[in-house]
Amino acid sequence: MIEVAEIIAREIRRGKIVEIGVGFYLEVAKRLRESGIDILVVDINEKAINYARKQGIKGVVDDIFNPTLGIYKDAKAIYSIRPAPEMMKPLLDLARKLKIPLYIVPLTGDRTPNGMKLINYKGIPIYKWEP
């Protein structure tokens, strides 16, 4: 999944990027941070956010189904790695409200919302929406 960090860092060179639904997998966020990106991870699970903070990653508890828009202020992009299918439409809705790019790496077989473009990067299917 490090490839996801590569393409995001290549396309969004600076500024704040937010990973939504981070869980306990921090490799993409760590790689983006190493690239000089201001990374923020978000999850509804407080334990996941505490884990991220212990790893030196900024994290905030939030619910994608009722997002606190102030958290995403000044974000240049949002992304999600293998989000649950029911999260995909709210992710796209948030990106549209914020008018920023959205990157989703779905689980194999999951359908992404209409209007997202497939980027096949080093064998990883990454779906992107941009305003």
From Swiss-Prot:
Annotated InterPro entries: SAM-dependent_MTases_sf, UPF0146
Gene3D superfamilies the record matches: Vaccinia Virus protein VP39
Pfam families, A to Z: UPF0146
Family matches, as SUPFAM superfamilies: S-adenosyl-L-methionine-dependent methyltransferases
Family classification: Belongs to the UPF0146 family.
Name this polypeptide is given: UPF0146 protein PH0209
